[in-house]
Amino acid sequence: MTLGDRLGLILIHPAVTTVPGLLEAKKLELSKKNYVIGDQFLINKLNDNSVTLEKDKYDLIYYLTPEKVEDIKFPVKLIPVIQSALKTNGSFYGLTEAFKVDALVNGFEIVSVEDNDYHWIKKAGSANANVVQLKTKKKLGNEVKSGKLPTFKSKLPTFKKKDAGNNEQVVKLSVEDVEDDLDDDPEVSNELLSKAKFFNSLSLNQDAEIDENNLIKSTDGDGITMITCGKTNTKKRRACKDCTCGMKELEEEEIDNIRTQQDKVVQFTSEELTEIDFTIEGKLVGGCGSCSLGDAFRCSGCPYLGLPAFKPGQPISLSSISDDL
């Protein structure tokens, strides 16, 4: 290392090994600018603290990665480490504008030129920057001493418990009050008025016990009410589950009549059955008229598909295809 040479460091992305010659080309380029590469480390070694950098040692630090400019990823926590390892006015290359805020926060000055030589420079005096502690101008309550919380002299308001004897009484409405209210609205039904009169006529004590037998009328036990099959919401009357009026028998009779009509199958005579017969000459044939010629001439819905060719009027023999059956 000569007097005019400057010390440099290369931080290598692990994927650089996939691009042969990239590292050597970068070393040659930096050597032409009078930089001597004293160290080179993998970025993951620096990230997991396997390697530590000395403070104010390097004039240049270069982050070498094969990633595209818009896809570069870098651990942000290493930016202050790099700033500490650079000398004053030292340069850091390899990152983009995406990390601009982190660079400014950590005391870098951004240099952007037209020949894609984008880099950061460690500003003078950034290493001696001190944190300024802010103090509040106003004091709340007593002064805060020795980290204790402030105290307040004002007391919280107190409330007295309400006496049990001052409970509100229930307001009862008389029939006259209800009638006055109903007169104001002529559209109210008379049913509401009759209900009000009924409940007002009851003079039962709330604490008195009521015998349930007194609520049963003398006519309630005269007899059992028979449930008869009546009309339902459906259009047609249907029998109940335990029908005793004969409705269930009528429904069963109707179902039997329907089944009897369904059992009557339409009977065809022999002439009607042979009205369309492809095996009898002179009878009507299908639309294609080629049913007897074989599968090559038959329609897709022909009933003779798969059978051998035959002459009209000749009985069909399956002996020719017995080997296939």
From Swiss-Prot:
Its cofactor is [2Fe-2S] cluster; [4Fe-4S] cluster. [2Fe-2S] cluster binds at residues 229, 240, 243, 245. InterPro entries: Anamorsin, CIAPIN1, Dre2_N. Its main location: cytoplasm. [4Fe-4S] cluster binds at residues 288, 291, 299, 302. The keyword Mitochondrion applies. Residues 170-222 are annotated as: Linker. Residues 1-169 are annotated as: N-terminal SAM-like domain. Keywords: 2Fe-2S, 4Fe-4S, Cytoplasm, Iron, Iron-sulfur, Metal-binding, Mitochondrion. A motif (Cx2C motif 1) lies at residues 288-291. GO terms for molecular function: 2 iron, 2 sulfur cluster binding; 4 iron, 4 sulfur cluster binding; electron transfer activity; metal ion binding. GO terms for cellular component: cytosolic [4Fe-4S] assembly targeting complex; mitochondrial intermembrane space. GO terms for biological process: cellular response to oxidative stress; iron-sulfur cluster assembly; negative regulation of hydrogen peroxide-mediated programmed cell death; negative regulation of nitric oxide biosynthetic process. A motif (Cx2C motif 2) lies at residues 299-302. Monomer. Interacts with TAH18. Interacts with MIA40. Component of the cytosolic iron-sulfur (Fe-S) protein assembly (CIA) machinery required for the maturation of extramitochondrial Fe-S proteins. Part of an electron transfer chain functioning in an early step of cytosolic Fe-S biogenesis, facilitating the de novo assembly of a [4Fe-4S] cluster on the scaffold complex CFD1-NBP35. Electrons are transferred to DRE2 from NADPH via the FAD- and FMN-containing protein TAH18. The C-terminal domain binds 2 Fe-S clusters but is otherwise mostly in an intrinsically disordered conformation. This is Fe-S cluster assembly protein DRE2. It comes from Vanderwaltozyma polyspora (strain ATCC 22028 / DSM 70294 / BCRC 21397 / CBS 2163 / NBRC 10782 / NRRL Y-8283 / UCD 57-17). The lineage of its organism: Eukaryota, Fungi, Dikarya, Ascomycota, Saccharomycotina.
